[in-house]
């Protein structure tokens, strides 16, 4: 399986990092070794002093697809979830300055937190989902999928032009504004439509 991530999919997040607004979805991939095992603490890697949380809505692909038409994209997933795209922001900044890929800053071990999955059918409108990230009990990120520049089905159609999607693949759909630094002993929790889907201790 592979983890396909979308960058710069919320306008306010683009502004907070002073990035240029893209004309097409920004796509990068995390290896499956980036998945943080369930119930395991996240250890800040030695190579970074500025790891940021980025909460994101996730979808899990249920069947093989290539060159998927947007109108059929909804048939390629049944589960929706929530996760964190941990980012070594200091390392990413150095890589961006040199025009190099971001993988070292986003694909390191444990950099992909994947919470519980919920049936897609349990939501009335995937284009209007509230989600939040709390740090030590306080809301630090609050988003709604209505603010996505490219919606879930658009992303599936776009990504499938370049990568064959396979059963079990996971798509991280982008983060809203409010990203920030984590420190040892922080406690993170994520909620989708009021349901807590993950909790996490930082070491």
Regions found by a protein language model. Give the residues of each.
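Catalytic-core "active-site belt" of small-molecule-metabolizing enzymes
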Residues: 1-162, 166, 170, 178-203
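Switch II (G3) loop of P-loop NTPases
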Residues: 175
């Amino acid at each position: 399986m592979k983890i396909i991530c979308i960058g710069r999919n919320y306008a306010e997040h683009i502004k907070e990092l002073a990035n240029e607004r893209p004309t097409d979805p920004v796509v990068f991939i995390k290896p499956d070794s980036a998945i943080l095992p369930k119930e395991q603490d996240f250890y800040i890697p030695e190579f970074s002093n500025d790891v940021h949380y980025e909460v994101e809505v996730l979808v899990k692909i249920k069947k093989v697809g290539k060159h998927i038409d947007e109108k059929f994209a909804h048939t390629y997933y049944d589960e929706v979830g929530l996760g964190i795209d941990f980012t070594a922001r200091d390392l990413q900044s150095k890589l961006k300055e040199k025009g190099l890929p971001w993988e070292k800053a986003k694909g390191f071990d444990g950099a992909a937190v994947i919470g519980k999955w919920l049936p897609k059918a349990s939501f009335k409108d995937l284009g209007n989902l509230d989600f939040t990230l709390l740090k030590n009990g306080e809301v630090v990120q609050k988003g709604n999928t209505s603010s996505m520049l490219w919606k879930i089905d658009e992303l599936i159609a776009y990504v499938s032009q370049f990568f064959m999607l396979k059963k079990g693949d996971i798509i991280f759909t982008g983060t809203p504004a409010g990203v920030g630094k984590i420190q040892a002993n922080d406690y993170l929790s994520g909620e989708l439509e009021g349901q807590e889907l993950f909790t996490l201790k930082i070491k």
